[in-house]
């Protein structure tokens, strides 16, 4: 049985089919009306126990109808009317629509990275060129100063540098003696006490295996008696001195005379102090003259030579009794006579 146009037109909402009219049949054919746009799908499925009995032919049925308010011709393909744009261009779902901005952003970032890399490269190249130029000028200045120093350097009698710390490296002290212990005072280390260099030599010998009594002290210092808190200070750790401008011995005496300075001895200072203390304030000028004459000579004279200084004929030890000193001594005698007469 076929479905006519008039009978299918009654399926518009609001109208009902007659209950006795068979909508579905096995020989399915219909004429599509003009007011139906897209789809009229009629699905006829057999039941789970399909037989040739026509009573089982309409087990499942679905009708989907879409209506168009403006009916068009049925010969128009639905895809052409749905995808046509007003300007006539076709809308394509290309991947370039999404990948285009991504590629553009990535390209811009890569260009920025390349620009910054070039800037860094040129700046580093310029810095390296300046560094090489500075090193070349520095080497030239060093060589020039070395040449000037070599030309102007004179032979000096002693070391006349700056602050210098002498420490003896040759009897390697054990580690337990270099770490101070808490039984000692924090501010007064007993290893740096007042008998600095009591057993040390006057002249510091060069480092090496020197066979002196200081090396034998290692046996005593590493023994079990020195592990406790009461150990005797060793001479090796104290053998150090500080020199300001001249090489010094351990006790602090200079090893070489400094040119341009006159060495003064303790004996001459004591001699001058005793002379100046025995006179009154009126004799200060004469005392100064006596001090200037005895300072340089008392270091070089023996005790027996101090009584006959005028009899010396050594040209290197010249003690002049000048006529000026004779005149001053005569004036002093006259002045003392006048004072005695006055009193």
From Swiss-Prot:
Q: Specify residue ranges for compositional bias: Polar residues.
A: 165-188
The answer to whether UniProt assigns keyword Transmembrane helix to this entry is: yes
Region listing for Disordered, in residue ranges: 66-89, 161-191, 252-343
List the biased-composition ranges (Low complexity). Answer: 71-84, 290-299
GO CC list: cell division site; cell tip; Golgi apparatus; Golgi membrane
Regions of compositional bias (Basic residues) in chain numbering: 334-343
Membrane topology type: Single-pass membrane protein
* Keywords, comma-separated and alphabetical: Golgi apparatus, Membrane, Transmembrane, Transmembrane helix
Instruction: List the transmembrane segments.
Output: 96-116
Protein's name according to its UniProt entry: Uncharacterized protein C36.11
Name the residue ranges with Basic and acidic residues bias.
Answer: 280-289, 301-311, 322-333
Tell me where in or outside the cell this protein is found: Golgi apparatus membrane
- Major location, coarse class? Golgi
């Amino acid at each position: 049985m076929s479905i006519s146009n008039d009978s299918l037109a009654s399926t518009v909402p609001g109208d009902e089919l007659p209950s006795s009219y068979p909508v579905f049949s096995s020989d399915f054919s219909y004429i599509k009306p003009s007011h139906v746009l897209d789809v009229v799908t009629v699905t006829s499925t057999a039941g789970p126990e399909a037989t040739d009995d026509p009573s089982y032919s309409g087990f499942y049925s679905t009708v989907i109808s879409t209506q168009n308010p403006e009916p068009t011709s049925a010969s128009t393909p639905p895809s052409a009317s749905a995808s046509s744009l007003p300007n006539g261009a076709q809308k394509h779902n290309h991947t370039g629509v999404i990948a285009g901005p991504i590629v553009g952003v990535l390209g811009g970032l890569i260009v920025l990275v390349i620009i910054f890399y070039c800037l860094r490269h040129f700046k580093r190249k310029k810095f390296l060129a300046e560094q090489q130029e500075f090193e070349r000028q520095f080497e030239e200045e060093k060589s020039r100063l070395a040449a000037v120093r070599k030309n102007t350097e004179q032979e000096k009698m002693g070391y006349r540098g700056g602050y210098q710390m002498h420490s003896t490296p040759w009897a390697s002290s054990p580690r337990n003696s270099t770490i101070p212990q808490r039984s000692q005072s924090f501010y007064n280390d007993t290893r740096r006490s007042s008998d600095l260099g009591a057993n040390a030599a006057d002249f510091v010998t060069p480092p090496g295996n020197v066979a002196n009594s200081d090396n034998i002290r290692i046996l005593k210092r590493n023994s079990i008696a020195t592990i406790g808190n009461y150990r005797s200070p060793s001479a090796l750790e104290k053998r150090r001195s500080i020199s300001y401008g001249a090489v010094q011995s351990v006790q602090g005496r200079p090893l070489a005379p400094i040119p341009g300075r006159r060495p003064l001895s303790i004996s001459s200072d004591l001699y001058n102090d005793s002379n100046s203390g025995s006179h009154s304030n009126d004799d200060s000028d004469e005392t100064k003259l006596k001090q200037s004459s005895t300072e340089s000579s008392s270091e070089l004279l023996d005790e027996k030579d101090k009584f006959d200084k005028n009899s010396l004929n050594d040209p290197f030890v010249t003690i002049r009794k000048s006529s000026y000193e004779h005149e001053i001594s005569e004036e002093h005698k006259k002045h003392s006579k006048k004072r005695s007469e006055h009193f």
